[in-house]
Amino acid sequence: TDVGSVKSGIVKAARQTLFEKFCNFVPGHPIAGTEKNGVEASLEDLFVNHRVILTPVEETCPKACKLITQMWKAAGADVVNLDVQHHDEVLAATSHLPHMLAYALVDCLAGMQERDEIFKYAAGGFADFTRIASSNPEMWHDICFSNRQALIRTLEIFSTHINKIKVAIEKSESNELLETFRRAKEARDKFNKEKNR
């Protein structure tokens, strides 16, 4: 198995290098971690109550899939299966896009003339939102290019949406702005409720 954030490239490489043993390879992605990396950042309970996505393909041996599922469950994880392409599309939205937003926001503000004051007066919300901008730049550089197509589609959708907010503010479209915020709050509250079940 593996722990990569993008599955399509890993599956392609494994198919080209493992040959007849490819059937024993079970692509996996634990949805757990922090912005820290390296051995010194290891956590013994990292996978407890976190989801691990397996993306078995047509050639994947059921016995290998069962073994890897048992391994992750023994580490305390909740194991689910997804199609390779669907995994990459979902993760582009839920993981890769948020990292791009955090990196872009911090880089943008750090380039402003008032940056010292901006960071001096930044509070908890800013810290929460930008924590992942402290993630490993090289790793995220590679993730961007590994999941390029899905990430570009997601960035385009987000760009359209953020532009609608900009236009609503410019044109004083109070109801449009308030409805956007209400929909977002409702979706976030639902996410929290389901996550804490």
Predicted features along the sequence, with ranges:
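Rossmann-like NAD(P)(H) cofactor-binding subdomain of soluble oxidoreductases
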Residues: T1-E40
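Conserved strand-to-helix beginnings and helix N-cap segments that scaffold or border functional pockets
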Residues: V11-K12, N37, P62-K66, L155
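Short, flexible, solvent-exposed loop/turn segments with mixed acidic/basic and small polar residues
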Residues: A41-L46, H141-D142
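Internal alpha-helical scaffold of NAD(P)-dependent oxidoreductase catalytic cores
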Residues: E44-R131
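Interdomain hinge/lid region at the active-site interface
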Residues: R115-A184
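Rossmann-like nucleotide/phosphate-binding core characteristic of flavoprotein oxidoreductases
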Residues: T180-R197
